[in-house]
């Protein structure tokens, strides 16, 4: 379970800020190294409420990483360029990457999916329940 939010007014000094980023090997220099990253995320929400910061990729998997992402939701009023990006100049995501994501964005993305993998973009995913984080006192 995870929830990432860029609040209204958030700015970033990064060249290519992302919601989640996963690499399989150090800077693409070890594609033959084993094991590579192979992980699962279940029940994830990424929310961009900032009109000042453009999220380059909501989900970026690259350089040999293999991801299984289930019940992901990307939402908000801020700009997200790529919903899911599986390509990189130093190595793409593992082709067996599987992602199920819904989007509730008020602005269109340039690309829903960039790269090769088993990515499903469809309505119906709920992401993580905010009740999970009630103990923090954060007001969603």
Question: Where in this protein do the model-derived segments appear?
Answer:
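Extracellular beta-rich repeat passengers
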Residues: 1-140
């Amino acid at each position: 379970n995870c929830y990432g939010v860029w609040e209204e007014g958030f700015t970033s000094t990064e060249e290519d800020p992302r919601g989640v980023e996963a690499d399989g090997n150090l800077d693409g220099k070890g594609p033959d190294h084993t094991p590579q990253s192979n992980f699962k995320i279940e029940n994830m929400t990424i929310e961009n409420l900032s009109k000042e910061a453009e999220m380059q990729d909501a989900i970026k998997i690259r350089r040999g990483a293999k991801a299984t992402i289930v019940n992901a939701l990307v939402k908000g009023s801020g700009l997200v360029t790529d919903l899911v990006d599986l390509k990189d100049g130093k190595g793409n995501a593992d082709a067996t990457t599987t992602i199920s994501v819904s989007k509730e964005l008020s602005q269109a993305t340039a690309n829903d999916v960039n790269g090769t993998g088993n990515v499903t973009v469809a309505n119906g995913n709920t992401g993580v329940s905010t009740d999970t984080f009630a103990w923090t006192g954060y007001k969603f």
